[in-house]
Swiss-Prot record:
Active site: E150, E257
Protein name: Endo-beta-1,4-glucanase A
pH dependence: Optimum pH is 4.0.
Sequence similarity: Belongs to the glycosyl hydrolase 5 (cellulase A) family.
Biological source species: Emericella nidulans (strain FGSC A4 / ATCC 38163 / CBS 112.46 / NRRL 194 / M139) (Aspergillus nidulans)
Primary gene name: eglA
Reactions performed catalytically: Endohydrolysis of (1->4)-beta-D-glucosidic linkages in cellulose, lichenin and cereal beta-D-glucans
Length: 326
């Protein structure tokens, strides 16, 4: 990142072209596992992603990895810190390991707008938390800051204000070159975005690198907990309204979570979703599968190489959308 050669490669990574994504990759889960068991024991309650298997996915064409972690483990006493040294260093090592591969690493506090189960109401405390993270990664242009995973059942103005507090704190910390992903209320669902999160268009970023992160699953209730997808076209249908919202408001989006189970309807639905997003890549910069990670076992969406069922069944579907494959 400190040389002109590397800077050129970074610019090549982020420059979108018509009909092509900027990012296609996967979530990396594990460090947020063991919810409620804090601080928990590494290897028992939680696990960090495997940089070896991330390297496999990177070599195959993925260029973005969203690293979930627990705020309670990172800052156990207060959102304002101090950090738990071992957990913090493990996070730093994971993120730097990803960016050393030339891929983007998304910092994902996987907390649903909550801290120890309580809704975060203090924008000052939230800003203090983000000051800690942004200061650490201020010089790494391949880091992306995701304000929080899937705010839900919260006051809508509070969701807006927490996002703005995070943006302001990140920029004030000197992290001015990185993208920021803002998430909305109601689990940041694309299919409910227009009805629930219209006020999010008021967010401002002095660096103009704000991306709206939405999630979308394809089962009947949109939860991503059922093996059946509604139809082969449900993907495009569920993101159409959000696509129009992005375009009408001059915003950019990323689908931060999507997935499908191992059946033909879901495979067709995922292909339909990706095709639609790529056709609208003037507003959709990319998408991330949910999820890879060492502990998924027989989970229906497991993207962990090489035994994960989704890795085996969906890699061929995802590959044409990898950046540089078009």
């Amino acid at each position: 990142m400190r040389s002109l050669v590397l800077l050129s490669s970074v610019l090549a990574l982020v420059a979108p072209s018509k009909g092509a994504f900027t990012w296609l990759g996967t979530n990396e889960a594990g460090a947020e596992f063991g919810e409620g068991s804090y601080p928990g024991e590494l290897g028992t309650e939680y696990i960090w992603p495997d940089l070896g298997t991330i390297g496999t996915l990177r070599n195959e064409g993925m260029n973005i990895f969203r690293v979930a972690f627990s705020m309670e483990r990172l800052v156990p006493d207060s959102l304002a810190g101090p950090v738990a040294d071992e957990y913090f260093q493990d996070l730093v090592e994971t993120v730097n390991g990803i960016t050393a591969l030339g891929a983007y690493a998304v910092l994902d506090p996987h907390n649903y707008g909550r801290y120890y189960g309580n809704i975060i109401t203090s924008t000052d405390d939230f800003a203090a938390f983000w000051t800690i993270l942004a200061t650490e990664f201020a010089s790494n242009e391949l880091v992306i800051f995701d304000t929080n995973n899937e705010y839900h059942t919260m006051d809508q103005s509070l969701v807006l204000n927490l996002n703005q507090a995070a943006i302001d704190a990140i920029r004030a910390s000197g992290a001015t070159s990185q993208y920021i992903f803002a998430e909305g209320n109601s689990w940041t669902g694309a299919w409910t975005w227009v009805d629930v999160n219209d006020n999010m268009k008021a967010l401002t970023d002095p660096q103009d690198k704000l991306i709206y992160e939405m999630h979308q699953y394809l089962d009947s209730d949109g939860s991503g907990t059922n093996t059946a997808c509604v139809s082969s076209t449900i993907g495009s249908e569920r993101v159409t309204a959000a696509t129009n919202w992005l375009r009408e408001n001059g915003k950019l989006g990323v689908l931060g979570e999507f997935a499908g189970a191992n059946n033909q309807v879901c495979k067709d639905a995922v292909a339909d979703l990706l095709e639609y997003l790529e056709e609208n890549s003037d507003v959709w910069l990319g998408a991330l599968w949910w999820a890879a990670g060492p502990w998924w076992g027989d989970y229906m969406f497991n993207m962990e190489p090489t035994s994960g069922i989704a890795y085996q069944e969906y890699s061929e579907i995802l590959q044409p959308y990898f950046v540089g494959s078009q």
